[in-house]
């Protein structure tokens, strides 16, 4: 898969917003970035791929500069992977987004936009352990409920035309 070709496996090293010279644990003084250029490039790569297919030209303007900025130099990581199917290329772009945007709070929205909840949000919970108290071992993504938020009851009370609530939520 594409994370293996990047030499990452399943390991993430948290470097975002980290300043090794800052005193204390959370005193970096670095501003939180709400949107990054890499996010724009990845959205563009995804949109082009879904509408007309990824090309080497688009790859070299989007994915390649992201990987170069991250320090990759191997041809396997930088060069356009010619001969991939539409689905394989889609997965490469999604994996790139997963790695590049890690811990920035966008993954949930990506999965919902892709309508890929059953693939990514069901089954065994994997990933880093941040808090030992979390004992969730498995989860079940429910398509009818989990792609939409509940309409707040206060809004339904103000405007009864909003009833009934979205599937999976009471009124």
Can you annotate each of these PLM segments?
Residues 1-2:
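Short, well-ordered junction/capping motifs at the entry into regular secondary structure
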Residues 5-171:
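Acidic/polar-rich alpha-helix caps and helix-coil junctions
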């Amino acid at each position: 898969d594409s994370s293996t070709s990047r030499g990452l496996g399943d390991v993430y090293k948290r470097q975002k917003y980290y300043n090794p010279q800052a005193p204390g644990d959370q005193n970096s003084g670095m501003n939180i970035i709400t949107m990054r250029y890499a996010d724009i490039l990845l959205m563009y790569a995804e949109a082009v791929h879904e509408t007309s297919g990824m090309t080497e030209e688009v790859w070299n303007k989007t994915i390649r500069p992201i990987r170069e900025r991250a320090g990759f130099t191997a041809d396997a990581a930088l060069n356009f992977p010619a001969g991939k199917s539409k689905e394989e290329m889609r997965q490469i772009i999604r994996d790139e987004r997963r790695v590049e945007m890690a811990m920035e709070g966008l993954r949930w929205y990506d999965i919902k936009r892709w309508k890929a909840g059953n693939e990514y949000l069901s089954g065994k919970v994997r990933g880093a352990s941040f808090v030992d108290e979390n004992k969730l071992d498995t989860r079940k993504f429910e398509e009818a409920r989990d792609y939409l938020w509940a309409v707040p009851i206060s809004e339904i009370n103000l405007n009864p035309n909003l009833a009934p609530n979205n599937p999976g939520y009471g009124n």
